[in-house]
């Protein structure tokens, strides 16, 4: 998928997940992927759920607005985030030093 792309108020992006991390945080860009560290293990979809919950909480949106569209069993996840503006996304990145 590559770089984040917008369709109206919907963001499409690729995230690289680091499961079983000591601290949940946004680690920065790794190429065209945003790297996110999560506490959850990569078992039974726990890391996928944790990723959607983490992003929703950090963006101040409902969990249902963050959808995993590809990468259920991979560290590389393609997500769709609905109902946010580019300015909210930019604030999120700045808040995490990205």
From Swiss-Prot:
Recorded hits in InterPro entries, A to Z, give: DUF167, YggU-like_sf
SUPFAM superfamilies associated with the record: YggU-like
* Cellular component, GO, one term: cytoplasm
Q: Which family is it part of? A: Belongs to the UPF0235 family.
Alphabetical list of PANTHER family matching this protein: UPF0235 PROTEIN C15ORF40
What name goes with this protein? UPF0235 protein Mmc1_3654
Species annotation: Magnetococcus marinus (strain ATCC BAA-1437 / JCM 17883 / MC-1)
């Amino acid at each position: 998928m590559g770089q984040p792309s917008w369709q109206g108020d919907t963001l499409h992006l690729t995230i690289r997940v680091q499961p079983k991390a000591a601290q949940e945080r946004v680690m920065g860009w790794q190429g065209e992927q945003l790297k996110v560290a999560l506490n959850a293990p990569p078992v039974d979809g726990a890391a996928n759920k944790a990723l959607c919950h983490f992003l929703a909480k950090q963006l101040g949106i409902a969990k249902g607005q963050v959808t995993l569209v590809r990468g259920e069993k991979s560290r590389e996840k393609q997500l769709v985030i609905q109902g946010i503006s580019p300015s909210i996304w930019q604030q999120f990145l700045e808040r995490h030093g990205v």
